Amino acid sequence: MARIAGVNIPDNKHAVISLTYIFGVGRTTAQKILEAVGIAPSTKVSQLDDTQLDAIRAQVSEYMTEGDLRREVSMNIKRLVDLGCYRGIRHRRNLPVRGQNTKNNARTRKGPTRPLKR
């Protein structure tokens, strides 16, 4: 298994799919990285040599990935909560943030149902 950005990516998959195992790298970003390096997206990771892997590592390091991206996302949410704005309040109460209705659905965000106390 090749190690890129602190993540073991699978050898038996196409390079474009393997790169998506890195947090912050989706299909489009993976295609851009491989295009910049000059590798066909359908190439298996096991067929890549060390120079190609180093070139991919260099390209991936230009993007914000893994721990840095997770930290930035959590800091953005913390900033909203500290501001006390509507979105921050919704985050604090574990409710949907983007305007969805909560009368019937939103069970994923709200958690399991609580029994009525009588």
From Swiss-Prot:
GO terms for biological process: translation. Keywords: Ribonucleoprotein, Ribosomal protein, RNA-binding, rRNA-binding, tRNA-binding. InterPro entries: Rbsml_uS13_C, Ribosomal_uS13, Ribosomal_uS13-like_H2TH, Ribosomal_uS13_bac-type, Ribosomal_uS13_CS. Coiled coil: none annotated. GO terms for cellular component: cytosol; small ribosomal subunit. It comes from the Bacteria. Residues 106-118 have a biased composition (Basic residues). Pfam families: Ribosomal_S13. Residues 92-118 are annotated as: Disordered. One of its GO terms (molecular function) is structural constituent of ribosome. Belongs to the universal ribosomal protein uS13 family. Located at the top of the head of the 30S subunit, it contacts several helices of the 16S rRNA. In the 70S ribosome it contacts the 23S rRNA (bridge B1a) and protein L5 of the 50S subunit (bridge B1b), connecting the 2 subunits; these bridges are implicated in subunit movement. Contacts the tRNAs in the A and P-sites. Part of the 30S ribosomal subunit. Forms a loose heterodimer with protein S19. Forms two bridges to the 50S subunit in the 70S ribosome. This is Small ribosomal subunit protein uS13. The lineage of its organism: Bacteria, Pseudomonadati, Pseudomonadota, Gammaproteobacteria, Moraxellales. The gene is rpsM.
